Amino acid sequence: MGVNDTHGGAPGHRHPHPPDDPSGHPRIGFVGAGRVSCALAVVFARAGWPVAAVATRDPDHEARFLELVPGARAAPSVSAIADDVDLVFVTVPDDAIADIAATLRLYAGQAAVHTSGALGSDVLEPARAAGTQIGSFHPMVAFAEQDAAVAALSGATVAVEGDEELVALLGQLATDIGAQPVRLPPTGKTAYHAAAVLAGGGIIGLLDGVAELARGAGLDEAGALAIYVPLIRQALDNAERIGIENALTGPFVRGDVGTVRGHLEALSRLAPGALEMYRATARRELSIAVSRGELDEAQAAPMRRLLEDR
């Protein structure tokens, strides 16, 4: 099925160029031509889903997109992109999505989809018209670099949400690019995205704190990464293999108050910017240790007092 299977809609609001792509897939257009849209356009086209058009106000981004996706054309405006496509992907910053939705003019049988991880499809309601559908398609991928993002999309998780028929189509699209679709309720997207920010950006913030503290031990950034990244990988592997609780090791499992006191003193002197982060993660680790039965509440109490903000 395709989004263009629906006909009718408001009088005088029929698609001016009915679909004729031999693949049977809806023709895709992008609003925005940044890293996300370029990577998605490349993998969609490789998977046999036709990418027909892009609308962007940035001429350099437009040129890059058209170079990456031969056969696509530049639409003169956001409102005009629907004239040549069936499925519009809105790949702009979250705060701009509602404004774009208000500008889109969808025809019956078309759909609009955004790629925000935090917002539900309801932000696209201004674009909805009779016989149209809205949804969201969020790949769990870091789009820092084009080639790496394209490679990472194969095997990635893609959160899909929105109108029933469209969600089925988006799930098929995700599968066709080698990704794993996961359906989310609209109310769950903010928590899902916050977890993604912790998993992706949070680990970088943690590494920055690690590097700051390691400088106190005479290590530069490269030296710190060489030592601590393998430890992080081991911890992640353990969590995946035996579960989060069982993967925890260190002074909080053992109840080593003296060790933690020494850490806090060193942080205060050498890396005060990382002190708050250490306390926050330490409190979480201590709770895991108690939950796991390594410490009881009486044993954990001295550590909790030590970790209180001051």
PLM feature segments, named:
Residues 1-18, 275-279, 284-310:
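SAM-dependent methyltransferases
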Residues 2-76, 80:
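NAD(P)+-binding Rossmann beta1-loop-alpha1 motif at the extreme N-terminus of oxidoreductases
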Residues 24-27, 109, 155:
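Phosphate-coordination loops involved in phosphoryl transfer and adenosine-cofactor binding
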Residues 29-30, 90, 160:
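Hydrophobic Val/Ile/Leu positions in short beta-strands of Rossmann-like dinucleotide-binding domains
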Residues 49-50, 132, 179, 219:
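Short phosphate-binding/catalytic loops that engage adenosine nucleotides
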Residues 59, 69-148:
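Rossmann-like NAD(P)(H) cofactor-binding subdomain of soluble oxidoreductases
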Residues 62-68, 127, 148-241:
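Internal alpha-helical scaffold of NAD(P)-dependent oxidoreductase catalytic cores
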Residues 237-299:
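Interdomain hinge/lid region at the active-site interface
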